[in-house]
């Protein structure tokens, strides 16, 4: 007996923009299908989708494990349009969100300890196989289907466009600070890099009651850091005198840079037993000097986006403290130009695609 066809297995006709193969790096209209809404699933009409550096790296084929055609986008805000019979988390018509993760094994140490984001078999939002073996497609599309365990309730008081980047950049910085104890009022934290991730790290740090110093190689970012985002200080990392004067002044550093850069001068800024939170993911290895760590009892902590429970906590915290990303809302047709600008760092501070109003179905859907 023949097995079900792909169209029978995935009856929901969908459309979006995809990179068709590993060589082009160019996004274009794409037709595909989503699975039917299962008993524990939520069908979601996508309103907005944020664009992050992971999306850029993915379309540039920097991750060999991804499958193509690839529909990127892992910062999704939408509306629940259908729910399975066993869904209790959300109702039809409510605003919902999805972050980077769509599934996990549910059995390993990480999963049973609510650390499913670190599960060895974690299913990320696109380019990887789902439980049934079919490939996941991301948020640059008109709709999606997700298990309720990974669906988030999106607070009504948050802007859906400004809130979309919270699903990646926001939770990454929030989770790192919460899990490492860098969320206590009065602590002094340095934020390295003032991009999409860095500017949200500043906002959450200030909401926690921390003293914040932005560390950057770009002098022009001082005004935005202090007057725009409320940072308490600005440190130009290329200025040897400024760096020398700041030695031993920070309780923690949040490093958000996604490019290779020297770590040793930053470690010197930490007090004894200070914490260096590494959030950026450069494509090449960083040089790690052992002496500053050993002599000061300092530690380096890596952190990826948080688990589902913590991501919901982050969204609720953001709503309470009026935290959203500074965004440039774009139509889907602008996506390739936006990726080029993102590659050059030419955005303050996040691109968000208006899916609802600009994504139209390709012909012959």
From Swiss-Prot:
It is found in: Cytoplasm, Cytosol. Changing residue 54 to F: Abolished activity. Changing residue 74 to H: Conserved ability to reduce precondylocarpine, but decreased accumulation of over reduced vincadifformine product. Gene3D superfamilies: Medium-chain alcohol dehydrogenases, catalytic domain, NAD(P)-binding Rossmann-like Domain. Changing residue 168 to C: Conserved ability to reduce precondylocarpine, but increased accumulation of over reduced vincadifformine product. Keywords: Alkaloid metabolism, Cytoplasm, Glycoprotein, Metal-binding, NADP, Oxidoreductase, Zinc. Its cofactor is Zn(2+). It catalyses: dihydroprecondylocarpine acetate + NADP(+) = precondylocarpine acetate + NADPH + H(+). NADP(+) binds at residues 194, 196-197, 216-218, 221, 279, 281, 303, 305, 350. Disulfide bonds: none annotated. Belongs to the zinc-containing alcohol dehydrogenase family. Component of the seco-iridoid and derivatives monoterpenoid indole alkaloids (MIAs, e.g. vinblastine, catharanthine, tabersonine, vincadifformine, vindoline, vincristine, quinine and strychnine) biosynthesis pathway. Catalyzes the non-canonical 1,4-reduction of an alpha,beta-unsaturated iminium moiety; by contrast with the classic alcohol dehydrogenase mechanism, this reaction does not require a catalytic zinc or proton relay. Converts precondylocarpine acetate to dihydroprecondylocarpine acetate, that is spontaneously converted into dehydrosecodine intermediate, precursor of angryline. Homodimer. Interaction with catharanthine synthase (CS) and tabersonine synthase (TS). This is Dehydroprecondylocarpine acetate synthase. It comes from Catharanthus roseus (Madagascar periwinkle).
């Amino acid at each position: 007996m023949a097995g079900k066809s792909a169209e029978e297995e995935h009856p929901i006709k969908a459309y979006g923009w995809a990179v068709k193969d590993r060589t082009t790096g160019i996004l274009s209209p794409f037709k595909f299908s989503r699975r039917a809404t299962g008993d524990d699933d939520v069908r979601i009409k996508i309103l907005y989708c944020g664009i992050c550096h992971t999306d850029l790296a993915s379309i540039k084929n920097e991750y060999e494990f991804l499958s193509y055609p690839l529909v990127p986008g892992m910062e999704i805000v939408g509306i629940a349009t259908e729910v399975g019979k066993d869904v209790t988390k959300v109702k039809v018509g409510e605003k919902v969100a999805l972050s980077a993760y769509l599934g996990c094994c549910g059995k390993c140490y990480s999963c049973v300890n609510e650390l499913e984001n670190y599960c060895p078999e974690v299913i990320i939002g696109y380019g990887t196989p789902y439980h049934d073996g079919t490939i996941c497609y991301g948020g640059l599309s008109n709709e999606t289907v997700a298990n309720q365990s990974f669906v988030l309730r999106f607070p009504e008081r948050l802007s859906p466009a400004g809130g979309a980047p919270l699903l990646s950049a926001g939770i990454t910085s929030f989770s790192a600070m919460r899990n490492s104890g860098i969320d206590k009022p009065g602590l002094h934290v340095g934020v390295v890099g003032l991009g999409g991730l860095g500017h949200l790290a500043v906002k959450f740090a200030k909401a926690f009651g921390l003293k914040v110093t932005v560390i950057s190689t770009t002098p022009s970012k001082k005004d935005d850091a202090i007057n725009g985002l409320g940072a308490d200080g600005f440190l130009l990392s290329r200025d040897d005198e400024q760096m020398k004067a700041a030695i031993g002044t920070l309780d923690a550093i949040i490093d958000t840079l996604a490019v290779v850069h020297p770590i040793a001068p930053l470690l010197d800024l930490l007090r004894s037993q200070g914490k260096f939170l590494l959030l950026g993911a450069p494509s090449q290895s960083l040089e790690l000097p052992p002496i500053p760590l050993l002599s000061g009892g300092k530690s380096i902590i890596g952190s990826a986006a948080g688990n589902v429970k913590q991501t919901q906590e982050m969204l609720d915290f953001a709503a309470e403290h009026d935290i959203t990303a500074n965004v440039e809302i774009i139509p889907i047709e602008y996506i390739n130009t936006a990726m080029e600008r993102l590659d050059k760092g030419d955005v303050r501070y996040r691109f968000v695609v208006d899916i609802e109003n600009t994504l139209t179905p390709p012909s012959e859907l």
